[in-house]
Curated annotation (Swiss-Prot):
UniProt keyword terms in alphabetical order: Proteasome
Molecular function GO terms recorded: enzyme regulator activity
Protein name in UniProt: 26S proteasome non-ATPase regulatory subunit 3
Gene designation: rpn-3
Organism field: Caenorhabditis elegans
One of the record's GO cellular component terms: proteasome regulatory particle, lid subcomplex
Assembly notes: The 26S proteasome is composed of a core protease, known as the 20S proteasome, capped at one or both ends by the 19S regulatory complex (RC). The RC is composed of at least 18 different subunits in two subcomplexes, the base and the lid, which form the portions proximal and distal to the 20S proteolytic core, respectively.
Stretches assigned to the PCI domain: 254-433
Record keyword Amino-acid biosynthesis present: no
Pfam families in alphabetical order: PCI (PF01399), Rpn3_C (PF08375)
Record-stated family: Belongs to the proteasome subunit S3 family.
Length: 504
């Protein structure tokens, strides 16, 4: 029917309705299955027996530790084809894990299937000793995390016996990791001192077989054992007799520098100790290792105070040091101000903390520095003061001892004064000389010389740490190549001569 005039017809336009994208729900990832696949890839890399692949696997070991559990280890051990027939049984007894019923593999119905005879001459491919030892190491780390120390020690000792029986250079990294965690468990059990002979024998074996990573780990743990048991002479003797491996990791090198710094500090060689602690801080990881950095910084503060240097306030304000260095901040204030009363109060109040940090021996020696600073301030404040008044300010009951201390400060050049009395057998007093301009002395020159030497040493270390491109190999021609080159030159000369003749 035709539309009437005057009426408008509105036609609906066909518009494609916008399709709503419904996000597809991703299936939940099985973290255990992912971990099993990742570790199987690592085991396949270890089976190749190449050192750089083994190093790469051990570098990601901290990440792998977070992925392992009873389920993952059970699947790995059950599917691992080791040359040792009792490997799986020996590992599973440490796990104490029973798989769930739904995860067990159901047997196939093979009643109507004809069995095929295996091919003749085909031998099964067994896993390498590297992958066996790596699986043992993962089980050891799992037991260590669960604090099953007895089982972990038994497994670790079996692991070391197996490694040293194979005598392979590629097992050095795995042996070093095993030794490290064994020593950690020994220390946790309080039995580290009882295993000094064991560590020494392992160090001899590692040195004879050139196991550099094992050497580095054993040297560090022997030094730690000696220092914990206060066998400082034995620690110094060990450092003088062994050669630390050049290709050791930065973590082991940082520990070695830290222990050397402690030995030098207890030998009162503060300059060398400060240098070792500085290198330990540089070699420490940029992220993590907070406990190690805190331990090093405590010794740095004490060594600086013994050298007459007051630590910068910004050090104590850093988040990782704010809490652990609170006692050392109060100690530094007492040393800076020469406040003997405050120093004695801090020493008595935080004595337990200083003993735990093994810094109490050096902090007690700081008392002489505090007294010397106090005497300096007294000599600047008083042109003349009686010895008995100095004894009151220094909280010393004996005037004779106070006079000896003042005389020692005068002899060391700490103050410019004399001890005298107005009459014979009268009260003795300290007469200070007029303060001289320090810039007229050689002390600023000595300070500038120390700073310049430090900057030059830092520059030299930076230059040594640079990496340069390898030199291009200059090709050395053989006798035949030289003869061919000479023959070509003669022919070329003849051609040039012929061309010249043609031109004429």
């Amino acid at each position: 029917m035709a539309p009437k005039t005057g009426e408008t017809v509105v036609e609906k336009m066909e518009v494609d309705e916008a399709k709503q994208d419904v996000p597809a729900t991703e299936p939940a990832k099985d973290l255990n299955a992912i971990a099993v696949e990742n570790i199987k890839e690592q085991l396949a890399a270890l089976d190749k027996g190449e050192e750089h692949l083994i190093t790469r696997v051990l570098q990601v070991l901290p990440k792998t530790r977070k992925q392992i559990n009873d389920n993952v280890l059970y699947k790995l051990v059950s599917s691992h084809l080791s040359s040792d027939a009792q490997f799986a049984e020996g590992m599973l007894k440490y796990l104490h894990y029973t798989p769930a019923a739904d995860t067990e593999v159901q047997p196939m119905d093979t009643s109507n299937v004809k069995t095929k005879s295996p091919k003749k001459g085909v031998k099964p491919v067994f896993a390498s000793p590297e992958s066996d030892c790596y699986l043992r190491l993962l089980v050891l780390l799992h037991l260590y995390a669960q604090k099953k120390n007895t089982e972990a020690l038994a497994l670790g000792e079996n692991q070391l016996t197996s490694i040293y029986n194979f005598d392979r250079r590629t097992l050095d990294g795995l042996a070093a990791k095993t030794l490290y965690f064994l020593c950690v468990i020994y220390e946790r059990e309080g039995r580290l001192f009882d295993h000094q002979g064991f560590l020494n024998s392992r160090l001899r074996t590692a040195t004879l077989r050139n196991f550099s990573e094992s050497q580095a780990v054993l040297i560090c743990w022997l030094l730690r054992c000696y220092l914990i048991n206060r066998q400082y002479q034995s620690a110094a003797h060990l450092v003088s007799k062994v050669a630390f491996p050049d290709n050791a990791s930065n973590n082991d090198l940082a520990r070695y520098m830290y222990y050397q710094g402690r030995i030098k500090a207890l030998q009162l060689d503060y300059n060398s100790a400060a240098g070792y602690f500085l290198q330990a801080q540089r070699k420490a990881p940029q992220e993590g290792a907070i406990g190690f950095k805190q331990a090093v910084q405590k010794w740095v503060v004490v060594i600086g105070l013994l050298q007459g240097e007051i630590p910068d306030r910004s050090v104590f304000r850093q988040p990782i040091y704010r809490k652990c260095l609170a006692h050392y901040l109060d100690l530094s204030r007492g040393v800076r101000d020469g406040d003997v009363a405050r120093f004695n109060h801090n020493l008595e109040q935080f004595k337990t903390q200083f003993e735990a940090d093994d810094t109490l021996t050096l902090i007690v020696r700081l008392r002489q520095n505090v007294i010397k600073t106090a005497i300096k301030q007294i000599s600047l404040a008083y042109s003349r003061i009686y010895i008995k008044d100095i004894a009151k300010k220094l909280y010393i009951t004996n005037e004779t001892e106070t006079e000896y201390i003042v005389a020692k400060a005068i002899a060391d050049g700490a103050i410019d004064a004399v001890i005298t009395s107005d009459v014979r057998d009268g009260p003795r007093y300290m007469q200070s000389s007029e303060t001289a301009d320090i810039y007229r002395t050689s002390e600023p020159q000595a300070h500038f010389d120390t700073r310049i030497r430090y900057c030059l040493e830092l520059h030299n270390q930076a230059v040594k740490a640079l990496r340069y491109p390898p030199k291009k190999k200059i090709a050395v021609e053989t006798i035949e190549q030289a003869r061919e080159r000479e023959q070509q030159e003669l022919e070329f000369a003849k051609e040039l001569a012929d061309e010249d003749d043609d031109d004429f």
